[in-house]
Structure formats: C-alpha cells, structure tokens
Regions:
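A local structural motif
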Residues: 56-69, 85-87, 189-201, 275, ...
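C-terminal segment of classical bacterial N-terminal signal peptides
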Residues: 17-25
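Conserved N-terminal structural module of periplasmic/extracytoplasmic solute-binding proteins
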Residues: 4, 8, 24-106, 112-125, ...
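Hinge/lid segment of periplasmic solute-binding proteins
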Residues: 95-170, 227-230, 255, 346-351
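Short helix-initiation/N-cap motifs at beta->coil->alpha
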Residues: 67-76, 204-209, 302-316
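Extracytoplasmic/periplasmic substrate-recognition and gating elements
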Residues: 59-62, 82, 152-157, 176-177, ...
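Glycine-centered hinge/linker elements that transmit conformational signals in sensory
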Residues: 209-218, 245, 249-305, 350
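Short, solvent-exposed loop/beta-turn-alpha elements that line the ligand-binding surface or hinge
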Residues: 111-127, 185-202, 239-242, 259-285, ...
Length: 430
C-alpha cells in the first residue's frame, strides 16, 4: 500500500494503585507525500513545516514534498494519478486541473469535513471569495454566485481545496531608469505623457503606454541608458509568450477579457463551446494587440520559449526594463547573490485597458494554487492532512509566509496593518 503510516508502540496501559487503568494512547508516524511545483512558495512551506509544525493529534508527521519543475508539473502529476500508484496524499494543484481530476475520482470532496469542523469553516469564511471560487468549488461557482447565496459554506456547493499560494501578476520595473530625470524628460518630450516612476504612476498605466515604454527603452549595445553606455542590447518590456503549459494564455486572456471578449461560452455548460467565442472579432483584435508588443521584447519572444522563468531571468540579468510576472517569482529578484538588479527593482500594478470613462480594466487570471487531498487516504491521514491545512492557514504562519515572498488569501491577513510593508509587491497583490 502506498499510504505510509506506522502506528507507534505507545499503547501505554498502566495499572494505578486504585486498580484503575489508563486508556490506550495511540500516536503514529505519518508521512504525507505532497506533489508540488518547484519554486519559492512551496520551498518555503517545506522549510517552515520542518521547523515549526507540531501535530495537534500528537503524531510525528513528515511532509515529504515531491518538487517537480513547472514545465512538466501537469504531466508528472497526471501520470501518477492515472497510473493508480497512489503516491500522493496531497497535491498542490493548479486550479485549472480541478474539474478534470475531480471527475477522475482523484481529489477528495471536503464539503462534509469543512461543515463538521469549526476551524475549517472559519478559514473558508475568511478566504477571499474569488479564491474560494477558483480554488475550491466544483462544479465551478463564480464569485457572484457564491456571494448571492450568502452562506459559507454555501448549501449545494462542493468544496475541494484550500489555497497553498494565491498568486497575482504585477509589474517588475527598474526604478533606476524609470525614475532617471533624463529618461523621464526624454519620454515626456517624445510621447507627451509621463514615464511611470512611482506606484501611483503604474496605477495609471495602460497598454498603450506599455508599448511606448517598450519602444522608448529599446537600446542597442553602446547606446546610453540612464547616462551609462550599454554592454549589450537592452529591451524595454517583456511578458509571457511561451508555448509550454499556460505560459502565454495567462497573459493573452487579460487582453481578451479587458476588451469585452471571452475564451468560451460557460453558460452552455456542460457542453460549453469555444468556437465563435475565442475567435470572435473582439477576441482576435485583443490577441492582435497582445502580439503587437512582442516587437519590443527580446528575440526569445519570437521562439515560443519566453515563459515566466525566462522573463524573470532576463530582468534579473539587467537586460529588460520592465516585465509582467507572478508575485511568486519576485523574491529571487531581490536576492543579491542571484540578481544584478536586486537594489534597483520596484513593483507596481500590471497595465490594463483604458475604458471610455478613463478608468483602467485590469481583469486577468488568478494565479496560484490550492492544495487538495487525494481519495485513497485512511481516515487518520485525512485528519492529519487537514491539520496541516489549518497550520498553513493560521494567521501566524501566513504572515511568516508573506514575509518570505508568499501571499495570503485570508482577508484578515491582507487587512493586517503590517501586510503591505512586508514585501514590496504586496500593495499590488491586494
């Protein structure tokens, strides 16, 4: 059996002087094997678990995280689940897989467990409803549908997961060049608008200005950038443009949604259709705008290989002025041992589409992942896995995770006065 649980020999039966006996005390060695993408948010969870987790049930619990590279994460997890090997007790699953693996019988329905446990109920009530919608419900319920019901847990709704790491994408930018007086003056002179320097400037940055930034900061080797001659070619902007996994759809969807298009007709479930929706005139126009900015990006953008890790590396190597990437990849940017721009980087909201009233629509995908339990665990392991969920989603652990580059989906934690100051991208996340 792949489930690893060994009962300890702590059946301690003592006879007291009165002749009464102490009831048997059972504890266990429990190993929870968890599939997880290999990146900072999951690495921190493992490190913090090993340092701080104590089982409330008295078990000796080991969290054995199987770290899998992102590009092959889905294939590896899917192969394990469909093989029948029953390797994992928990999985950090991307939310877009939820329905497929629930239908396959691999992910455990947690609805009754949540309803019977006041701690789990309180956690669910504190989670941002957009995350409950994306990470937990199947069949999928929108945030609006959940809020209309009004109860948490909502009657008639099935719940499967809790957030391990709720992610959003933000703008990473070089403050030393975007706030350089000479560059700011030249940009203003060329385009008649300001070069975004502050967080507030990025709040008012749309896709048109994003393209202007890309054009403006395209410099060749030997050109001056912020008064310094360049040793290599330099590019103004970059965002996801990769063929692997979801390394382009997570950006293209934003263009489509912001302009009023969609990628499929969800109202026709369970026979929802994409034909005529994702290739509508509105969606095609939005996709063309996405493509139009690739001309200002490094040559790798033309190869289908410019994924979230490639743009992160380009930024850290000082070859790009601004990127749009996930918060989960922000921490290495600030690491002096890994990043040439660790002391020059700042963060702001991602650009969006300007509306007729002057506002900016930043509708986009929710990133991040829930963790789920698999369906073949014994009751004792299910209970301990849920204890791990409670430990991870208590406010003390969540604030520690945020301080180390993670994010929280708990509204109480995001409302904490210290939250925005814990990491430089937190304001944009909230």
């Amino acid at each position: 059996m792949k489930l690893r649980k060994v009962i300890k020999g702590i059946i301690a039966v003592s006879v007291l002087a009165t002749g009464m006996s102490v009831a048997p005390v059972l504890a266990a060695d429990i190993t929870i094997t968890m599939a997880a993408p290999d990146w900072p948010p999951t690495r921190f969870m493992k490190e913090h678990f090993d340092k701080s987790y104590t089982s409330p049930a008295g078990h000796t619990t080991t969290l054995d995280m199987d770290f899998i590279p992102w590009p092959s994460f889905y294939e590896r997890v899917a192969a394990s689940l469909t093989s029948g090997e029953q390797k994992y007790q928990m999985i950090v699953t991307d939310s877009q897989w939820l329905g497929a693996f629930v239908e396959g019988g691999y992910y455990m329905n947690l609805t009754d467990k949540i309803a019977a446990d006041p701690e789990l109920t309180a956690i669910l009530q504190d989670l941002h409803p957009a995350l409950v919608s994306a990470y937990s419900t199947y069949p999928h319920k929108t945030r609006a549908q959940l809020e209309e019901i009004g109860e948490v847990p909502a009657p008639g709704v099935a719940y499967y997961g809790f957030p391990q790491f709720p992610d959003t994408y933000v703008t990473f930018y070089r403050q030393d060049i975007f706030c350089h007086e000479g560059e700011m003056a030249a940009f203003q002179n060329k385009y008649g608008t300001n070069l975004p320097c502050s967080y507030e400037d990025w709040q008012d940055t749309d896709w048109t200005k994003w393209g202007q930034v890309g054009e403006f900061f395209r410099r060749a080797k030997g050109d001056l950038l912020a008064g310094v001659a360049l040793d290599d070619d330099f590019y103004g902007i970059a965002y996801q443009a990769g063929k692997g996994y979801d390394f382009s759809t997570m950006q293209t969807n934003a263009f489509i949604w912001q302009q009023g298009g969609d990628i499929w007709d969800e109202s026709k479930m369970p026979t929802a259709q994409a034909e005529g929706v994702v290739n509508s005139d509105v969606a095609v126009k939005a996709f063309d705008e996405y493509l139009s900015y690739l001309q200002y990006m490094p040559p790798v953008s033309q190869t289908g290989q410019m994924d979230i890790f490639v743009i992160q590396d380009l930024f850290m190597q000082g070859k790009v002025g601004a990127i749009i990437d996930w918060v989960g990849l922000g921490e290495p940017v600030l690491d002096p041992s890994a990043s040439k721009v660790h002391d020059k980087s700042a963060f702001g909201p991602a650009p969006g589409s300007r509306k007729n009233d002057g506002s900016i629509d930043r509708t986009g995908n929710i990133g991040g992942q829930p963790f789920v339990l698999t369906t073949w665990n014994e009751d004792e392991v299910v209970d301990e896995a849920l204890n791990v969920v409670k430990w991870w989603l208590n406010s003390e652990t969540q604030l520690e995770a945020v301080s180390n580059g993670g994010q929280s989906g708990l509204m109480s934690v995001m409302a904490d006065p210290s939250y925005n100051g814990l990491r430089p991208w937190n304001r944009a996340h909230v």
